Structure formats: C-alpha cells, structure tokens
C-alpha cells in the first residue's frame, strides 16, 4: 500500500524507524497484529470516498472482528473535535483505520486497491 500513488503513509509497527520496529518485534512475538493505519492523500473527502468505495470491508467503529473493518475517524469517532484537536490526537484528515479479518488476502487487497483508486478521483473545490 505504501507505494500506491494515493497513499501518503502506512502506519504499522514494523514499518517505522529501526528503534520502533525493533521494539515491535521484541514485544509482538507472534507478529504485529491485524490493525493498520493509512493516510490517504486528498484529506477528508478522499478518506470518506475511500470508505464509501469499499465493497468487502465493513464500515464500523469496532475492531477485532473476524470480518475486515474500516473507519475514517475524522468523520466518525472523532468528528466532534476541531482540526487542531484532531491533529493533536494523531488523526489526520485522510487517516483511515483498518482491522484485517479472515477473508482471503487477495479479496482484501483487491478491495483496498479499488477503493484507493476511487479515492484519488476526488475533485477539490475552490474556496473563495
């Protein structure tokens, strides 16, 4: 995902700088787990469009289900916060949280790819 043109950043423990990655490997003996964060280019509208474009992943606030789940915190769980408060909480406008379930990996990857392609088609509105 990190190489996709519409992805700003992938947030996953072993993808961080060496110090953080080494700690993740030390403490997460069985692997990193199924939670992944991605920052989608294009801000809030692109994040919303990504979520709306998912066909396999469910758009829900809980995590840790057998099903793959996705949420856009800026417009759901954290929507009551100001832009400054969102950033202080580490929630960027295009941030999407994923909880990967037990579906076939190829199906999950295909759904994420098509949603990323769709999210890149956001038309920015001019502000006067």
What is each PLM-predicted segment?
Residues 58-60, 106-107:
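Short amphipathic alpha-helical segments with coiled-coil-like heptad repeat character
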Residues 1-55, 61-67, 81-87, 114, ...:
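Conserved small-domain helix->loop->beta segment predominantly found in fold-type I
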Residues 52-53, 68-128:
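PLP-dependent enzyme catalytic core of the Aspartate aminotransferase-like
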């Amino acid at each position: 995902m990190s190489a996709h043109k519409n992805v700003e950043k992938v947030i996953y423990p072993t993808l961080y700088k060496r110090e953080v990655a080494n700690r993740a490997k030390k403490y997460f003996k069985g692997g990193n787990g199924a939670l992944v964060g991605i920052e989608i280019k294009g801000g809030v509208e692109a994040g919303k469009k990504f979520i709306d474009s998912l066909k396999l992943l469910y758009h829900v606030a809980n995590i840790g289900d057998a099903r793959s789940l996705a949420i856009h915190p800026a417009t759901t769980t954290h929507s009551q916060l100001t832009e400054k408060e969102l950033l202080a909480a580490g929630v960027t406008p295009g941030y999407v949280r994923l909880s990967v379930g037990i579906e076939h990996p190829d199906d999950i990857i295909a759904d994420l790819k098509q949603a990323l392609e769709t999210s890149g088609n956001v038309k920015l509105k001019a502000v006067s």
